[in-house]
């Protein structure tokens, strides 16, 4: 499979890509390890071979780029190659990133990490608990893919209305 061609990202797409980057920027240094970036591409549903991923990474870094880390501009270059118009596909990719242990659901700890990383202000444990209860429609203590899709769609609709 050839690497997809880059396209211009819209403001919302850039914001979403940067939220994902921020999750992997563990030390808030505006960099993420290349090894994590490769994992991010895989978790986001990409089926590139190791060679294709390395070619994309090399292109994103540029000729004098850091071989161990990737910055936000490089990450946005990568995002422009895989971002899709299809909302459900986009939501599913985000779910896979947030489902850190890959068990098909987002548990409280994963949800707490997300909510405290992507929000403008970190949420308290009580606020995270309340948000989890709201998102966990069937009350089984985890957020599955349909619940996550509903949560994201509700959030997008609320943002459009405000």
Curated annotation (Swiss-Prot):
Superkingdom of the source species: Eukaryota
Listed GO MF terms: calcium ion binding
Gene3D superfamilies, sorted: EF-hand
Subcellular compartments: Cytoplasm
Residues that bind Ca(2+) 1: 99, 101, 103, 110
Sites where the protein binds Ca(2+) 2: 136, 138, 140, 147
SUPFAM superfamilies: EF-hand
GO cellular component assignments: cytoplasm; myosin II complex
PTM-bearing positions, type N-acetylalanine: 2
Function field: The exact function of this protein is not yet known. It interacts with CAVPT, a protein also of unknown function, in a calcium-dependent way. This protein binds two calcium ions.
Protein name, as recorded: Calcium vector protein
